[in-house]
């Protein structure tokens, strides 16, 4: 206790005598209050404004849409009139119409051997192998066929129609800006070969726009071998959002919380979204975030304002401690890769943060500001490895500058943690869901961060709560550096009960994490901590409709919780309804 609050006051930088006396007076009063609280096993420093922001859960967003359907209108190909049963001597096989592959490559694919006697059926099978090769490599409208021909000297020709775009038409039936919509189709031009990858990329970018639906049609063009592309953009839902409830709040500001998010989609035709998110635990914590973002080509740019106020209760109620957080933000994202199976986004932003903590018992006020620039990458990938799986990952580099404006708090910081000033942080995340059987899947995730120096609590990571080691409370072990690992075995109950609605999983899990409290310790106390737990859970969800998560976690080991009363087990419940 003394190491935290007295912090070698005599070693503070030279200040006015009166200011040093005020520091001593305030620290003594807080110390007296905390000594009274220290009789309980879970006493800790009062959680301030920066720590309160840590309890806000990730925003609940609708999952991205699947690849918009591509309807292909059939087109006939000329066929040979020779009888199927007739066998002919073929000395050479020629391929015409190809540009993407050499003739030798395509002939090799057929397995043709010069001097063979083959039937029309066998020749058609060779043509089918060529067509299948094109389609396997993404040229999904390509055709290969036997044209009507006179066979001379045993020479047979297979004709290839690789498929090229004819007319490209955008039929926009929404208020979405025509230049914006057509700009997302740039790169697909008349005369280009029809390939699935670039087409799906453009359709996905269009379908990512909130408030619109996208479908496309490939119809036979006016010229042989061409397909006209018609892209229809129709109105989607103008208002979306969610309501949520959980028990993942801070123990001292209210564990039970309710919240709601409302999105107004595409109000000005710029692929824009105006959003409002609110969350409350009652008088203990109230949170709100308003944001607006719009598209400029493929780039999304946005602004946001966040506000939070809190008031400590429970054992800290006698302090009459309360505070506020305000954050003004600008942010942006750009899709580096957008496809059916692989996505990668570049992200960046700037936050101007203001923190205020007040303790009425001691008439003390602590003001801090932070300017934070961050940039990163985030992506996901679907694959067929080991029966199929999905991976996600992110990496974020933060450059910040903390300004402790209250002289007394700055003096204490200078003698202890020295968080004031410039800092850097590198945060990482990786996760994978792996299919084992139709009923069983495995999940693994790791989250962590590295720091350049001791960090303000607003930049620290914690080990407790439903997104970390679930056997410990929210706010447990806030630290500068560390990691959390989550491992789960998931059993799909719907496979056992055919009438089971939606997707329901029984989950068994193990969580573990280790942290270094201070990057540069200033006391001789224990600076590291390791926590672990295990438990079971039940998850129930329907795509973009609702989510229910319930977990029971038991501690592994004897580490005592300090952010809330210690318990051997903890129960977490999360409810989300999308609209």
Regions found by a protein language model. Give the residues of each.
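Feature captures outer-membrane beta-barrel proteins of Gram-negative bacteria and organelles
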Residues: 258-267, 286-305, 326-336, 373-381, ...
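C-terminal transmembrane beta-barrel domains of outer membrane proteins
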Residues: 3, 414-579
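Membrane-embedded beta-strand positions of outer-membrane beta-barrel proteins
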Residues: 241-243, 262, 274-278, 301-305, ...
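Short loop/turn motifs that connect adjacent beta-strands in outer-membrane beta-barrel proteins
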Residues: 267-273, 298-300, 337-344, 382-391, ...
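Residues that define the transmembrane beta-barrel architecture of outer-membrane proteins
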Residues: 225, 254-258, 284-288, 324-328, ...
